Amino acid sequence: MFEVKMGSKMCMNASCGTTSTVEWKKGWPLRSGLLADLCYRCGSAYESSLFCEQFHKDQSGWRECYLCSKRLHCGCIASKVTIELMDYGGVGCSTCACCHQLNLNTRGENPGVFSRLPMKTLADRQHVNGESGGRNEGDLFSQPLVMGGDKREEFMPHRGFGKLMSPESTTTGHRLDAAGEMHESSPLQPSLNMGLAVNPFSPSFATEAVEGMKHISPSQSNMVHCSASNILQKPSRPAISTPPVASKSAQARIGRPPVEGRGRGHLLPRYWPKYTDKEVQQISGNLNLNIVPLFEKTLSASDAGRIGRLVLPKACAEAYFPPISQSEGIPLKIQDVRGREWTFQFRYWPNNNSRMYVLEGVTPCIQSMMLQAGDTVTFSRVDPGGKLIMGSRKAANAGDMQGCGLTNGTSTEDTSSSGVTENPPSINGSSCISLIPKELNGMPENLNSETNGGRIGDDPTRVKEKKRTRTIGAKNKRLLLHSEESMELRLTWEEAQDLLRPSPSVKPTIVVIEEQEIEEYDEPPVFGKRTIVTTKPSGEQERWATCDDCSKWRRLPVDALLSFKWTCIDNVWDVSRCSCSAPEESLKELENVLKVGREHKKRRTGESQAAKSQQEPCGLDALASAAVLGDTIGEPEVATTTRHPRHRAGCSCIVCIQPPSGKGRHKPTCGCTVCSTVKRRFKTLMMRRKKKQLERDVTAAEDKKKKDMELAESDKSKEEKEVNTARIDLNSDPYNKEDVEAVAVEKEESRKRAIGQCSGVVAQDASDVLGVTELEGEGKNVREEPRVSS
């Protein structure tokens, strides 16, 4: 049994309007961007392309397809995606229009507008306009291409050649309504060869055309009209006002909704195929097949990676691929544009009560096509036969793209399809356009020069529009100045002073200030050679330096001043070693020199660290350090981290207490600041747990004591009640004092026993409380000891 769904939805079919259905389906796209809600019956009819035949039989607007004579309902939003308005008038279904256009391109000719119209239609049109039937075709073309005999000009001033109706713009005084018909039949969806150059129906184009036609002779008018008609027939050719720089991208890719497939009305525009006529013709010619474009997908970084799977749009996969009911899927054979057949695994992954369709095993195919992230994979189908074809289209400026920077179907850059060689037509190669005056060009004179406003010598066909990109380099790791490798990069102030040398050509001026001689120079200092000074056992000092050419060590006087660039030739102090070919000093002396240099460096580094360690904190810094470090303030830091560079040394936050990466866990006997803090926290935590446990025990003891006291009182009251209600003992003498005293003593002893039991419980509880107090005191002493020691 089907469950009827009711709610606030209502079927958007005007002849239905139901609010309850078994299943709600999606229909035609609305102006708001959403899809119409249809009931199960209406939605099924819409998906089967039988909506108008079932619900709009008696409505007006029915016409026949120009090619297959199929009845089409024009002007209905439900059949909008299944109808194509032909360039030469009339309507056609999407399948016939696409196939007819491919056949025209295959023949390599583009017949005129009137040669493709039926003779009956042309004769009727001439009769209605009052034209004589004997007019030849040349007369028709000799008339100016005008529009405006239509009432739509009042409401659509931005369309048409409205100003061409003026008497100045006509040469024969006749009007041609065929151009108006051509304007009426402008396709709702642009054809495959429609370009994005200049709209010939724009008002600026029309105005400039009128002004230009005033200055040309009647003999040239026919040629101008011929070129204008050619522009209308072949919108894919570059427009006359398009500069040569944009000629390469004049044939832009415009997405067209698919003509077939289940739920094709649900496909988003970014998945619509964007083939050009040349690409389809090239692929069809290579494979000797009739190709029907289906959809395309821009590769993401994961699609082009080594994972080996291509994520497909859900609507496209369900519309054009075989239906699958199991998650494992089925093997699917797809052929590429070179004719090679690939076998992929077509499956889906459950995802939030939905499905994510993927093609697995696509890595070899993508690698053979040499695709990367940002390129586009296209899917087509062979008609007839239904075989799937997989093509590709590389993105322009692939080197400038970082990852997948393009969205699906929104690329405005020029692209090239694999296996397709596209040669954009040159503007200068058209003989008709060359006869059009400059006024029709619509470009300023400075941009209409031979160099197009550019530099002389530049080839305008090779000039490309540069894309503004920002090169993002690899992330540089932060230089850790405290590492052992970077220690060698440190330079103390004394070493920097040793590198500064006075200019050798300048003599100093000696000034005495407070009995101290100071040398003053007029020229700035120069950088000298870095050397090592050693001391002999006799106390004599020597200077050692390396040659920049042979890297050999040379012994020099201690007062020698070397330039920044020093070689053995400059060694004027030792004639035997003034050449790079001279042997070096003994190895033993060199080892001593290098050892002295390393010890000197280490000693200076140790002195600087000792000076830093001697700087004890004071004031608030000392209190903060004592609170954090405790009694380990003087110990060196063992496990430092650079995760929080602004944190104080010894910070015990959750980030800084983590051990450094790659060094593992600390030993149990580790006494660093982090481990001490963790141990102290653990000890405090255990003391708190023990204290809480003792408190719970005391509470339980008090509750038990109360219960015992209540029980004793109940027993006592019961005994008193029994005594009061007891029978008279005939064997006892009420006036016998001994019997009365014995009964009283027995009662007193029972009362004392009850009191003694209660006092024992209280004493035990008091001892427990005393133990808790002692533990608290110990914890307090443990916390106060680090502060006292600090």
UniProtKB/Swiss-Prot annotation:
GO terms for cellular component: mitochondrion; nucleus. One of its GO terms (molecular function) is DNA-binding transcription factor activity. A zinc finger (CW-type) spans 538-588. It comes from the Eukaryota. Its main location: nucleus. Residues 694-724 have a biased composition (Basic and acidic residues). Gene3D superfamilies: 3.30.40.100, DNA-binding pseudobarrel domain (2.40.330.10). Residues 405-429 have a biased composition (Polar residues). Keywords: Coiled coil, DNA-binding, Metal-binding, Nucleus, Repressor, Transcription, Transcription regulation, Zinc, Zinc-finger. Zn(2+) binds at residues 547, 550, 568, 580. Residues 234-260, 400-429, 446-468, 689-737 are annotated as: Disordered. CDD domains: B3_DNA. It is found in: Nucleus. Pfam families: B3, zf-CW. PANTHER family: B3 DOMAIN-CONTAINING PROTEIN OS07G0563300, B3 DOMAIN-CONTAINING TRANSCRIPTION REPRESSOR VAL1. Transcriptional repressor of gene expression involved in embryonic pathways, such as LEC1, ABI3, and FUS3. Repressor of the sugar-inducible genes involved in the seed maturation program in seedlings. Plays an essential role in regulating the transition from seed maturation to seedling growth. Functionally redundant with VAL2/HSL1. This is B3 domain-containing transcription repressor VAL1. The lineage of its organism: Eukaryota, Viridiplantae, Streptophyta, Embryophyta, Tracheophyta.
